[in-house]
Amino acid sequence: MSKLTTGSFSIEDLESVQITINNIVGAAKEAAEEKAKELGPMGPTAMAGLASYRSWNLLLLDRYEPVLTPMCDQCCYCTYGPCDLSGNKRGACGIDMAGQTGREFFLRVITGTACHAAHGRHLLDHVIEVFGEDLPLNLGESNVLTPNVTICTGLSPKTLGECRAPMEYVEEQLTQLLATIHAGQESAEIDYDSKALFSGSLDHVGMEVSDIAQVSAYDFPKADPEAPLIEIGMGSIDKSKPLIVAIGHNVAGVTYIMDYMEENNLTDKMEIAGLCCTAFDMTRYKEADRRAPYAKIVGSLAKELKVIRSGMPDVIVVDEQCVRGDVLSESQKLKIPVIASNEKIMMGLPDRTDADVDSIVEEIKSGAIPGCVMLDYDKLGELIPKIAEVMAPIRDAEGITAIPTDEEFKVYIDKCVKCGECMLACPEELDIPEALEYAAKGSYEYLEALHDVCIGCRRCEQVCKKEIPILNVLEKAAQKSISEEKGWVRSGRGQASDAEIRKEGLNLVMGTTPGIIAIIGCPNYPAGTKDVYLIAEEFLKRNYLLAVSGCSAMDIGMFKDEDGKTLYEKYPGTFAGGGLLNTGSCVSNAHISGAAEKVAGIFAQRTLAGNLAEIADYTLNRVGACGLAWGAYSQKAASIGTGCNIYGIPAVLGPHSSKYRRALIAKNYDESKWKVYDGRDGSEMTIPPAPEFLLTTAETWQEAIPMMAKACIRPSDNNMGRSIKLTHWMELSKKYLGVEPEDWWKFVRNEADLPLAKREELLKRLEAEHGWEIDWKRKKIISGPKIKFDVSAQPTNLKRLCKEA
């Protein structure tokens, strides 16, 4: 082979010559070096793969041991099965019950991750097509725009186009993760847990890309603590106007409907309202300048079937995620057209993407089709308002609704034979027979009370031998309260600004702000929507920082105090103690985890890029935070919570969530699990059992409250912070459980840690019950605590972070 030499030649006289330049020698290296200079310091795990976080994950899983709650004893994954795995038996492929249960949980986590990532991909591609890849990311007064992206990939995108790389990274890793579920792949439960944690971190990347893309492109509020207040509830809808109802999570198509309404002066002539997270994002559209909003929120996922049965919508447009599988069949009964606007949910409807808008309207008006698929958003924007205008008078004239008349109501009540099948089928175990029995005697308040607790699943109706439309009966009994159902919720503000993080970071790390309480997730509550309101109210009164999102954020806004004010009207939307900030829809959850990460990056000056273990170690030991997904039902909720767990942020779930099959709970009595390094010299130091779980469930909201307060205690709390946190935890335990916690003394390092109002009493108890030596003249603890307080200690789980390592 001849040796290549350098030189030059002229192409001026050459004809019919095609020159292809592949890589310019040295150019890629130079570009990479320039990019590295721009990004700054880089941690060890940029563009992490399946094994990159394994050592950190196993460290977490060693302390927070998986507690498995399998749903059944069988595995039905392949044609060898079904295999009985009970009694420590293994399946034909060799997998045991632990491995199979780990696989089941992991499958739910990657499903949730894929859902958010696919949402982000669709949204990102669409806004790039419309607004161009050079559109800057504008999230408000922030320089740290993408903490989750930066931690996992090492990248810090500044434009829409630069968001493609992290999106491609998530998609590639999801393919690798999905492959591990195949028969004959991973079988160790502990490694499925590790992979689940990795998938959770990817989920927060996908969510972050989704929300920063729409915040930037659609002019959503940008880190705005005074984002507009939005009307919520069925009572907020003007029933004299045609009603468009949007259901789902991807707002891209709905923005075209709103544009058409604005351009054609229809915003005061018809109502547009949403269910689930599309509802939040349509109320954020073009609200960066705080214009008067006109879009409304009907409610959460639990309201979907109730709204359809009411007959109020004149057209329903669905996009993706959290859309009931019976939306079309239920809507057809009431002549409500359904338009599918996203490839992920097409409902078997005819595709009319290439058809003329007016011809589609005519088909729907005549009843030739019950709805259609419409993937052309320009046409969608015109189609939906036109259908609403045409169908509203037709449906009004026929008085279409599933709500029974007074006569029908009486007949249905009298048909009940008290067999109890409905109660057995109900996920909430509602005593429907008893309520119907009282109703038969003329007392309807019991039926009315079930309206808020009912999650609208319709399982009761399907087992009723007398074919009573139970959901309709409940709605009939609650007509008055439904008509008055009106609250206020703050539109999603987006992320916490860098300035807010700098100001509040010290309070969070020292513990003087007791903690961040994040109330997120779905409406599968065990005892009605008011639970999340009561939890939020309690923590706000105690100056915790509350971050909320999704369906839970909606339900918090549905209740008012004795002065007629919602929590959103009473408390500021700032990232500070006593603040109630609604970040927005489900994908905005990335801003909640991102806030904890930004405390490490901005306040503590830790390197974010490619540095997950160090950031997670910081939040685990220093940032008091706890999540609550009280009504979690979906795979997305599992992936969101698991993504918090890898960062050392614990989460409490409602009682239904044991069906996810896995919890992460430490043994608070095993002292060997509560040893860390002191970053100053690498010596071993003992810490209190805090937090004592990463993922667990509670049976009641009264149990959850003190559990969450305790979960905000951190090893690095200073004396004032520990005293404040112990005060709240002990008071809340006494208030809601009737007893003080039995292990409060384990968190006392010296007398300054004790709650100020009860210091002398607690010193006496420490002396009498635990044998601690007290100097009563100075009221100081002489001996007793196993944990010594050292204000300069640097607790860390990572040996490499120690100065003498």
Curated annotation (Swiss-Prot):
Pfam family, one: Prismane
Textual note on the cofactor: Binds 7 [4Fe-4S] clusters per heterotetramer. Binds 2 [Ni-4Fe-4S] clusters per heterotetramer.
InterPro entries per record: 4Fe4S_Fe-S-bd (IPR017896), 4Fe4S_Fe_S_CS (IPR017900), CdhA (IPR004460), HCP/CODH (IPR004137), Prismane-like_a/b-sand (IPR016099), Prismane-like_sf (IPR011254)
Binding site for [4Fe-4S] cluster 3: C416, C419, C422, C464
Reactions mediated catalytically: CO + 2 oxidized [2Fe-2S]-[ferredoxin] + H2O = 2 reduced [2Fe-2S]-[ferredoxin] + CO2 + 2 H(+)
GO molecular function terms noted in the UniProt entry: 4 iron, 4 sulfur cluster binding; anaerobic carbon-monoxide dehydrogenase activity; hydroxylamine reductase activity; iron ion binding; nickel cation binding; peroxidase activity
Binding annotation for CO: H116
Binding site for [Ni-4Fe-4S] cluster: H249, C277, C322, C522, C551, C586
Binding, [4Fe-4S] cluster 2: C75, C78, C83, C93
GO process terms (BP): acetyl-CoA metabolic process; methanogenesis, from acetate; nitric oxide catabolic process; response to hydrogen peroxide
The protein's annotated pathway: One-carbon metabolism; methanogenesis from acetate
Cross-referenced Gene3D superfamilies: 3.30.70.20, 3.40.50.2030, Carbon monoxide dehydrogenase alpha subunit. Chain M, domain 1 (1.10.8.190)
EC nos: 1.2.7.4
Protein family according to the UniProt entry: Belongs to the Ni-containing carbon monoxide dehydrogenase family.
Function comment: Part of the ACDS complex that catalyzes the reversible cleavage of acetyl-CoA, allowing growth on acetate as sole source of carbon and energy. The alpha-epsilon subcomponent functions as a carbon monoxide dehydrogenase.
Domain writeup: Cluster B is an all-cysteinyl-liganded 4Fe-4S cluster; cluster C is a mixed Ni-Fe-S cluster which is the active site of CO oxidation. Cluster D is also an all-cysteinyl-liganded 4Fe-4S cluster that bridges the two subunits of the CODH dimer. Contains two additional 4Fe-4S clusters, dubbed E and F, that probably transport electrons from ferredoxin to the B cluster.
NCBIfam families in the record: cdhA
The protein's name: Acetyl-CoA decarbonylase/synthase complex subunit alpha 2
